[in-house]
């Protein structure tokens, strides 16, 4: 068992090697203060034949890590929570580019949170633990990678802030990479204002992150290299292509390949390439279908990159900075509070907005918070198979759908002025040919406005890409699905005219240089300006249907009257909600009543509640202390009996008064009783 301590910027990390989970390929216990994470890597030695990287990353939170028992009916951890899925994606997207292109050994990385202090950053800790475990496993010649988070408080950048400091920040920037370059970025603005960050300041933050990562990665490599396992698998020489087959494709089928590349729809493109493969397979039996498809893919990729880098022309004939045609329609769905159809080329997003009450907010439990938190702004992204021409069933929400919805939410959240509003936006992707999450941001921003939600400014998003060959590279604006698949970078950037509110960068390379990232940010700003101009023109044409939008009426009653509005077993409030078709939130301690719904119904509901409470007060005023009444038993309960009083209303005869007089009552009996007190709007009775 080995213990390693590493001191880096603003934190001291401890690693216990070979202490637990020793049957895994590698394992360690990561400790940062009171946060402890078990990281394990398991690598199977049997190759898989499929052409993909068989990597699985799972980040798991245990409730006991914070001294909690899981909420809900089942008292054990079940389906992964959103934070766990998003953190798993964060780690996967960082580590995946490090693997050799022909790595085909099933690999599982598991991060299990065993103890957690909420002041520590779980995502940075989990990624650093995963990186160390993968480096120690030595399944392939990996570079060391690490993560850091950057906050901005009072115009000063802070590296690896505590949770309490991050809550005061206007910036949340998560960056991971090697000591040479960055390979994954997540960013969002924070606070009550929009807090969009200008591009020069973003570069400054990224430079600070790069410096931190370089220091940490250097320490990791120096410290962990002596503890690495023996190299399990050496990097192979890659696929050996048949030169005769490549020449055949370039000479006889080149025009058909170009036709496939220029096909805008994914299904159409696949049909072209499948037909080429079929023709060659039938005409040349010496080549098997697998090597034909691999060679075809190589020629296609080479030609796409040549077109972009040498000719500065993209597969769909656009210039490098050209954005596809944009159209925007509003108020398509008459019963929704808002609906926006945003179309950019062959990517189409229908975003629907609905406003709700406090009861509609999504409640989450997390190790990051002591108590359950309420998510008031929700953005749900759906990617049905028909949007890319696939014939398959629609299943549960995928990791990708959850991630894209979270990105859109982060882009728009600070644009909302009133953070107490409960808002749900749903993006239905009806067509997809790249950049659907950024189309969702554009449509979502307009949907907020169309719902009558006050916003600081419109927010637009664009997906940027890059293609590189050696020292040459080209940055692409508004990438298509083909450019995303064949390119080296997917950089989604959202913001307004002033700066950036959210961004997400992934790469298929080992990393991207800061100079290229900054050029991409500046190019994306020009694209945003173009898109925002179109969005502002569309905004002017939106007619907000205030008569259909829900309105909220808030008023106060005496706190002891709230129970009267609720009624026995919730009977009264259920009847009110069903009668007027509204939503009601009640606050017992303060006596606040919040009604939400159609304006006319809301006003009628308020009037009904006030009249109802007034009538109850009048009933009480008819009776006096020590007044003797002839009452009728209305219902028997465990603690006594409720009696109907002769002048209206009801009173409670408690069980102890019945037992003292040895009276056995049943419903419908008449009995003489005496008023003994008024308590919180209730009449207490005794036998006369």
Swiss-Prot record:
Chief site of localization: cytoplasm
Range of residues in the leader sequence: none
Positions contributing to Mg(2+) binding: 484, 490
Reactions it catalyzes: RNA(n+1) + phosphate = RNA(n) + a ribonucleoside 5'-diphosphate
Protein name: Polyribonucleotide nucleotidyltransferase
Top-level taxon: Bacteria
Gene name of the record: pnp
The enzyme's E.C. designation: 2.7.7.8
Cofactor: Mg(2+)
GO biological process: mRNA catabolic process; RNA processing
S1 motif domain ranges (all copies): 626-688
Organism field: Helicobacter acinonychis (strain Sheeba)
Keywords assigned: Cytoplasm, Magnesium, Metal-binding, Nucleotidyltransferase, RNA-binding, Transferase
